[in-house]
Amino acid sequence: MGKPARKGCDWKRFLRNNWLLLSTVVAVVLGIVIGVLVREYSKLSNLEKFYFSFPGEILMRMLKLVILPLIVSSMITGVATLDSNVSGKIGLRAVVYYFCTTLIAVILGIVLVVSIKPGVTQKVNEIDRTGNTPEVSTVDAMLDLIRNMFPENLVQACFQQYKTTREEVELSEEPGTNSTEATVTAIMTTAISKNKTKEYKVVGMYSDGINVLGLIVFCLVLGIVIGRKWEKGQILVDFFNALSDATMKIVQIIMCYMPIGILFLIAGKIIEVEDWEIFRKLGLYMATVLSGLAIHSIVILPLIYFIIVRKNPFQFAMGMAQALLTALMISSSSATLPVTFRCAEEKNRVDKRITRFVLPVGATINMDGTALYEAVAAVFIAQLNDLDLSVGQIITISVTATAASIGAAGVPQPGLVTMVIVLSAVGLPAEDVTLIIAVDWLLDRFRTMVNVLGDAFGTGIVEKLSKKELEQMDVSSEVNIVNPFTLESTALDNEDSDTKKSYVNGGFAVDKSDTISFTQTSQF
């Protein structure tokens, strides 16, 4: 009689602990079924499609709402609660991990696309083009990345990023001086045939979107400053700790709505797709990308985790299942960040000092899936154009894809912009990016899931490598709790200083027998 009761109890406990994950899986299945049925048996107008996706739009807006307070509070508290030397070591380990896994992903993608050759059997004119090619200068994009790391207005950085564009200037006109504060101009001259020149001015403007890099740099510096043993700084640390905890409670409320939002997100996207024929034409290319993402997430990342941490990587990945499903559905590492925090801290029990410091940085610069996708896409486009890439060009693609994926968060429309940068680096036609835009929305979801998984494994690996420093901080913290004050020696009134000595700080007096008593005043 006892065993069945225990099994029933375990089953109920499993449902209670995983109801959100199970309901999300059910929502995904229902979303696919509803999307296919509505697409097959009902012809919705564009306006009706827009209304149909409204519940999913609400989910996206709620998740994006908590990104800013979560990044700011978690970064500041994560850095402030760590010693400056410890935070430096943790940051270095995280960056080395990010760089190595991204480079491995790029190499894997190139090996697969060169072996499978998805573009050899097709021609450029056989694939329909979709969308427009963004005009991107590699130099300008890199400079914008650095500019966005140092925003001139912190409030503006919360909702806008800096971006430069080039405008052609008529040769007959002298370059004027524009005193408008909103634009920054520079004259650039490019030589063309017949000794003629084209003149450009680089115009600075702002585009919508959180300047994540700028906020992270500011929060990093602020966390280091207030994290020092400074009485007034502790007030700010407590404030941001409270803000972080409050934000996570809001995230818990949002996650209760998540299954409904995901259902309408996936169904709405299926209804919106107009031409499914493009998936057949680009089937081999998509299979190459998805194979690379699968190998990286199922073999490489778990293997690295197992070698370093010596724990079951698949159990760790199961703990991140809710975050991975969310990333798959909403296609945004930053918007998934609240769920990633919750899974890492509550399901996998990763130290909060690690997650708060590592995850915001990882969501910004660790883009394994994106780097793999860009490498595959660049070689695929070269194969479509019957171009044989040299070893030097392949190395260039590897380096550029790695660097571009790391800096993707610092530029608007990161997917297209970084893809154009990679193509331009090896002399491939940038306009051919329009050949793969039609399937990008689907591949983006899978590569975002790989990005989030890489961030999660990173927290576990960095925690293991930083175990000694964290234990030393715990011991130091316990010592401070036992004796939290710096005691100053003094003699109490009406007492013989040779026979009895007290140690006074603030409003406490401690004698040699370690008996604590309140004094009437803190001034002696």
UniProtKB/Swiss-Prot annotation:
| One Pfam family it belongs to | SDF
Which positions bind L-aspartate?
331, 333, 370, 411, 447-448, 451
Extracellular side, ranges: 39-61, 115-205, 267-286, 381-393, 428-440
> Carbohydrate attachment sites?
178, 195
| Biological-process GO terms, alphabetical | chloride transmembrane transport; cysteine transport; L-aspartate import across plasma membrane; L-aspartate transmembrane transport; L-glutamate import across plasma membrane; L-glutamate transmembrane transport; transepithelial transport; transport across blood-brain barrier
Query: Which keywords are on file for this protein?
Result: Amino-acid transport, Cell membrane, Chloride, Endosome, Glycoprotein, Membrane, Metal-binding, Phosphoprotein, Potassium, Sodium, Symport, Synapse, Synaptosome, Transmembrane, Transmembrane helix, Transport
Spell out the reaction equation it catalyses.
K(+)(in) + L-glutamate(out) + 3 Na(+)(out) + H(+)(out) = K(+)(out) + L-glutamate(in) + 3 Na(+)(in) + H(+)(in); K(+)(in) + L-aspartate(out) + 3 Na(+)(out) + H(+)(out) = K(+)(out) + L-aspartate(in) + 3 Na(+)(in) + H(+)(in); D-aspartate(out) + K(+)(in) + 3 Na(+)(out) + H(+)(out) = D-aspartate(in) + K(+)(out) + 3 Na(+)(in) + H(+)(in); K(+)(in) + L-cysteine(out) + 3 Na(+)(out) + H(+)(out) = K(+)(out) + L-cysteine(in) + 3 Na(+)(in) + H(+)(in)
GO-annotated molecular function = chloride transmembrane transporter activity; cysteine transmembrane transporter activity; glutamate:sodium symporter activity; high-affinity L-glutamate transmembrane transporter activity; L-glutamate transmembrane transporter activity; metal ion binding
Gene Ontology CC entries for this record: apical plasma membrane; cell periphery; early endosome membrane; late endosome membrane; neuron projection; plasma membrane; recycling endosome membrane; synapse
Location of this chain's protein in the cell? Cell membrane; Apical cell membrane; Synapse, Synaptosome; Early endosome membrane
Keyword DNA-binding recorded: no
Could you tell me which SUPFAM superfamilies the record lists for this protein? Proton glutamate symport protein
Q: Which residues bind Na(+) 2?
A: 364, 405-406, 408
Query: Hey, which stretches end up on the Cytoplasmic side?
Result: 1-18, 83-93, 230-238, 309-313, 345-353, 463-524
- The main location is membrane
PTM sites of type Phosphoserine: 517, 522
Keyword Cell cycle in the entry? The reply is no
The record's intramembrane ranges read 314-344, 394-427
Q: How does it assemble?
A: Homotrimer. Interacts with ARL6IP5. Interacts with RTN2 (via N-terminus); the interaction promotes cell surface expression of SLC1A1. Interacts with SORCS2; this interaction is important for normal expression at the cell membrane.
Which family does the record assign? Belongs to the dicarboxylate/amino acid:cation symporter (DAACS) (TC 2.A.23) family. SLC1A1 subfamily.
Entry domain remark: Contains eight transmembrane regions plus two helical hairpins that dip into the membrane. These helical hairpin structures play an important role in the transport process. The first enters the membrane from the cytoplasmic side, the second one from the extracellular side. During the transport cycle, the regions involved in amino acid transport, and especially the helical hairpins, move vertically by about 15-18 Angstroms, alternating between exposure to the aqueous phase and reinsertion in the lipid bilayer. In contrast, the regions involved in trimerization do not move.
What is this protein for, i.e. what is its function? Sodium-dependent, high-affinity amino acid transporter that mediates the uptake of L-glutamate and also L-aspartate and D-aspartate. Can also transport L-cysteine. Functions as a symporter that transports one amino acid molecule together with two or three Na(+) ions and one proton, in parallel with the counter-transport of one K(+) ion. Mediates Cl(-) flux that is not coupled to amino acid transport; this avoids the accumulation of negative charges due to aspartate and Na(+) symport. Plays an important role in L-glutamate and L-aspartate reabsorption in renal tubuli.
Q: What is this protein called?
A: Excitatory amino acid transporter 3
- Gene (name only): SLC1A1
